[in-house]
UniProtKB/Swiss-Prot annotation:
Any one GO molecular-function label of the UniProt entry: DNA-binding transcription factor activity
Chain ranges of the HTH deoR-type domain: 3-58
SMART domains membership: DeoRC (SM01134), HTH_DEOR (SM00420)
The gene coding this protein: ulaR
Biological process annotations from GO: negative regulation of DNA-templated transcription
DNA-binding segment(s): 20-39
Gene3D superfamilies: Winged helix-like DNA-binding domain superfamily/Winged helix DNA-binding domain
One cellular component term from this protein's GO annotations in UniProt: cytoplasm
The protein, known as: HTH-type transcriptional regulator UlaR
Keywords: Cytoplasm, DNA-binding, Repressor, Transcription, Transcription regulation
Compartments (UniProt record): Cytoplasm
Length: 251
């Protein structure tokens, strides 16, 4: 296979998935990790994709602005619905929850809406939904608006550390035995500031993300209290996480 052919296939993968890891490229093209990284570097230099740590993103990729009208278009939607329902059942009346951005986060917000629970979020589509539905207690974290993800980010992360919650629900592009990975560094760093002030960290990722490593390490596995994922998740990775004290629920 020529370099041009590899590049074409890699771009087709990105057009379909939006994001690929080096491991996925190696598996799909039957090449070495070094060759995969060279291909990604060349395509990044030519402006055809965006290189991220351990992978690449489609250059035209825009994070969807999730609403009740388009959530059904989310990848692995049915599995994410089950994950959100299971997560909502963890929270008791009167408790507070921190919910971050993404389709699973929006689904969880829908499940929590109307219940006697305080919801803390920096995800504006979810905040707008909760306000429209007249949810009793919504706290919107302050900061600078980030258009690409429809969230607010505190430049120094100082404000985020003031928002303590009983639960923090978050998701990502990858979860391995080492921990949870996020591809957006600014978002990850802002959320990291809150890890020390929340009661429990619960990771919500569909089964396709288990065993994938992409971006920066957001939290070590031993910092994660619970993982809720799909039934098709990589069993080896789940066993490794359980050995480190992570409680796992497959739905």
């Amino acid at each position: 296979m020529t370099e041009a052919q590899r590049h074409q296939i890699l771009l087709e993968m990105l057009a379909q998935l939006g994001f690929v890891t080096v491991e996925k490229v190696v598996e799909r093209l039957g090449i070495s990790p070094a060759t995969a990284r060279r291909d990604i570097n060349k395509l990044d230099e030519s402006g055809k994709l965006k290189k991220v740590r351990n992978g690449a993103e489609a250059i035209t990729q825009q994070r969807p602005r999730w609403t009740p009208m388009n959530l059904h278009q989310a990848q692995n939607h049915d599995e994410k619905v089950r994950i959100a329902k299971a997560a909502s059942q963890l929270v008791n009346p009167g408790e507070s929850v921190v919910i971050n951005c993404g389709s699973t986060a929006f689904l969880l917000g829908q499940e929590m809406c109307g219940k006697p629970v305080q919801i803390i979020t920096n995800y504006l589509p979810l905040a707008n939904y909760l306000i429209d539905q007249e949810h009793d207690s919504v706290i919107i974290m302050g900061g600078q608006y980030n258009k690409s993800q429809s969230i607010t980010l505190s430049p120094q992360g100082s404000e985020n550390s003031l928002y303590a919650g009983h639960w923090m629900f978050t998701s990502s592009k990858g979860l391995t035995a080492e921990g949870l990975y996020k591809t957006d560094m600014l978002t990850a760093m802002a959320e990291q500031k809150m890890l020390s002030v929340v009661g429990k960290l619960v990771v919500l990722v569909d089964s396709s993300k288990i065993g994938e490593r992409a971006g920066m390490l957001f939290s070590r596995a031993d910092q994660i209290d619970m993982l809720i994922t799909g039934k098709n998740a990589n069993p080896e990775t789940l066993q490794q996480l359980e050995a480190q004290g992570v409680s796992i629920l497959r739905v």
